[in-house]
Amino acid sequence: MSGIFGALRLPASVLFGSGQRAAIGMMTAQIGKRALVCTDARMGQDVQFKAIVADIAANGVEVKVYDRTEADLPMAGITACVQEYANYKPDVVLGIGGGSCMDMAKCVAVLLQHGGSLRDYYGENKIPGPVAPVIAVPTTSGTGSEVTPVAVIADTERGTKVGISSPYLIPRVAVCDPELTLTCPPGLTAVSGADALTHAIESYTAARREVTADLAVKNVFVGKNALSDMFGLLALKNI
């Protein structure tokens, strides 16, 4: 096949702007009546985070918080969260924080829906079907996990980080409120910016793949294309 090819896989809703965190409670209530929020210990004590959780509850949603997400997302932490809330059966899982918190929400959504071990899903397109809806709320500016079909975890037994990739991992909703990044430590802000720059460079310089009708059906990663070029170059200019 020849000609222009482009592919985008995105959440059903992406909200961006200062103060948009005020929509999280309403968006959650549109999806279900029981919510599980995944975050880390620092964010769990944040005033803005507590206000978000209170707003979810004020919208008539029962909400539980798991605030023990660790950096780089060791598999044991994911397993612990799933075991703790399996009987709760949340209708929606929220990841609020950095990339590890959002990836925690994605992995928990997979295991609550399909069971098994995370190792069953290593690689590309191993998730057999839809997972519990995820709402992703980044509090750093670099990961991009709020709009991607990827989760990265640390398999400590194997001593490596592993990716799980599937369109089913794309969050239902992404809420990007720049005000949530203002309390991010300066060092983490710098690293997050470098991370965002790296993602943009990788997008723009990726190798092209042969374009076929089933390229985006059989593959999560479709290579360099017209749309990735457009957004990658825009990101490079803005960063």
Regions found by a protein language model. Give the residues of each.
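ATP/NTP phosphate-donor binding region
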Residues: 1-92
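Glycine-rich phosphate-binding loop
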Residues: 90-103
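Short Gly/Thr/Asp-enriched flexible loops that form oxyanion-binding sites at enzyme active sites
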Residues: 52, 82, 101-114, 147-148
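Active-site segments that bind and position negatively charged phosphate/pyrophosphate groups
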Residues: 209-239
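Structural signal for hydrophobic packing residues in well-ordered secondary-structure cores
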Residues: 28, 32, 56, 60, ...
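A glycine/threonine-rich phosphate-anchoring loop and its flanking beta-alpha core
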Residues: 12, 113-212, 220
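Conserved active-site and cofactor/substrate-binding residues in soluble primary-metabolism enzymes
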Residues: 19, 23, 47, 51, ...
